[in-house]
Structures are given as C-alpha cells and as structure tokens.
Amino acid sequence: MDALRLAALAEPVTTTGPSPGGMTARVGTLPDLLDRVIGSRLDRVGAAFRWGIGAGHDSASAEAHAAIAIRTARDRGSWLGFATGDPWRDALLADLGVALAALLDDLTPRQAEIAGRVLVDGARQAEVAAALGVSRATVSVAVARGRLPAIASARRAIEALLVGPPPVALGGGEGVAPAARPR
C-alpha cells in the first residue's frame, strides 16, 4: 500500500473577500499540519486564512485534492476544507470540518488563547494557568465552556478519516485482523 501524501493550500481572507489562488503550505506530519491549521485559526491577532487539505497516494493527487478542498471551502463560505478523492470520507470530512470550524469560531479570545496552549502546544491545564497567571479553576472553566474536548474529538476524527482505514481492514478479509479470526 502506498504511503499517505498530504498537501495543504492556504489563502488569506480579507474583509473585501477572498484572495483566490493561495499558497502551498509546507506539510510535515498530519498532526503538525492540523496543529498549524488550528493554531492559525486560534490566532485572533494575525490574518485569517482559508485552508484546503488534500490527501492522496502521491504528491500530484494530494495537491489536486488540496485545490478541490480550498475551492469547495471558498464556495461554501468556510475557512476549512478537506478532500481525499473518496466520496464517503469526503462527505464525513465536510461535516466534521463544519463542526470543527464552528467550535473554533465560537471561542472567546481568552478561550482561544487557552485552546492554543492546550490543543496545539500540548500544555497541561496547570501549566497554562501558571503561564497566564490565573487559577487552574479559571483554565478548567475555559476548557469546559470552550468545549475543548469536543474540538479535540473532531480533530482526531478528521485525522483518522484523512489517513483512511487501517491496512487490516483493507486486507484482513471481513474487516477482522487475521489473528482475531476463529480457526
């Protein structure tokens, strides 16, 4: 089975409308890419970007899917789009992308700052509280009200769908690992 290839396109969104065309974002690992996308949305000071993330079995298909993803996001008025070339996965990714975007956009500036430290930087709540000079209870309330566990869940689901089914499900017969099948 070929390794997963990723491509990402980003374009600034201005108050006068989008700036079509975009630029190719450097892609490392999928978790790093999702950190970058989420982090860019949580940065309430910088410019807003629209992202199109494509997955494929080679660089050309990943780049083509990224172009489709950003165009679809632009057409839907969203800042986030995904495409894999698999209609079933793409439909689920579209719905999850809407949910993730809504959750991130609903965060207050303080919740966004805390979300960046927890979800992107991987800091523990106590570390965030110390860094911000607030109580741990304040951070805990922000995590709950900002629905950070739901954001993390949506992110994990998106990551799993972009990667696709595990090889066992593809080659293990009826979706069961060979060792788990009765003999």
Residue locations for each model-derived region?
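Short, Lys/Arg-enriched C-terminal cap helix and immediately downstream tail that follows
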Residues: 147-162
